Amino acid sequence: GLGANIHTSLSGVVESVDEMNIVVKLDKEQSDDYVKLEPTDDHLQRIKDAGIVGVGGAGFPTGIKLSAQIPGGYVIANAAECEPVLGHNVRYMEEHPEELVRGLKYILKLTGAKEGYIAIKTKYRKALLALGKACKNEPNISIKILPNMYPAGDERVIVRETLGVVLKPGQLPLEANAIISNVETIKRIVEAIELDKPLIDKDITVGGRVHNPDIFMDVPIGLPISVFIEKAGGYINPHGEIVRGGPFTGRPAKEEEPINKTTGGLLVAMPYPQEREKVGILICECGAQEERLRQIADGMGAEVVSVQMCKRMKPDKNGRLRCELPGICPGQAEKVLTMKKDGAKAVIAGTCQD
């Protein structure tokens, strides 16, 4: 099956292992260095050895993704920083644009692709300027502009906006002769190849109901979430749940849970308003799914009386409901009227737009 190597970010002794966790008792003294990977000139094997996965959220093993050959194709760096509030990818691009370009060149060589694109929103002006300078003398790497909307970082949106190819629900970028990789994933590829470094660190954004919202770069994977809530000045009271991820697709998390390879955001929410009335929930692939929307309704003390799906939701080849055109909302008036007829007094929506 699919999987990736796991490396501890701090030194210590393994105390226990179960299906979800490897618990390490940390040594009192920690080195500033890390145990380097064995030297190799095989870059694809190096990526596999490092345990790199798609750190933007999907978690797919990068060594498997980059084993595909796409001669004449395209490698696209997903620089959308898709979810609101999050800012660590933008910070990286502002500060290390040349490193991102080097990473793209490694992937071009691995996959046989002819061109590399950095797909980014226009609102990230400082990052755009830095990347423009870094790409100036790179004939095979250029910048592609994404619309300032959610979910601009969806792979099918990126393919549509950069290559002009509309993928059907369930189709992968490979069917457009393209490979897409999140910018932080590319950062970790560069570290593995140039520094013999395994994937042991993560960039995160901490925001919401904390005193000092901030971006933390290269934090050790495995430390508890509570450490970074504290580093951000602690909670502002009253506060609600911690959301791991972004506002649209994040999920509830507990303080004691660890930072993992795909953690990007830690957002402290407001307490749920106690509406205690009948609501409808509107589901779309672009946002929160039914389970999450029901959690929100429960937190509000509301009764779910109607469940509707965006009319763009269609089954893919595996029967999973997917959005036909992510980011292009068809309007939800018909669905809202249906929920009203079902007795809903309010709507909790998981769609990409109003």
Each language-model region and where it sits:
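Cofactor-cradling patches in redox/metallo enzymes
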Residues: 92-98, 123, 305-354
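Histidine-anchored nucleotide/phosphate-binding helix
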Residues: 94-111, 295-297
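Redox- and metal-dependent alpha/beta enzyme cores, enriched for Fe-S-associated oxidoreductases
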Residues: 279-324
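Generic structural motif
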Residues: 1, 7-16
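A glycine- and small/hydrophobic-rich beta-loop-beta segment
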Residues: 234, 249-284, 288, 294-299
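Hydrophobic alpha-helical positions that pack around
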Residues: 114-225, 231-238, 246
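Gly-rich Lys/Arg/Thr-decorated short loops/hinges at beta-loop-alpha junctions or inter-strand turns
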Residues: 75-89, 210, 313-319
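Hydrophobic alpha-helical hairpins/lids featuring a short glycine-rich hinge
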Residues: 23-26, 30-79, 84-87
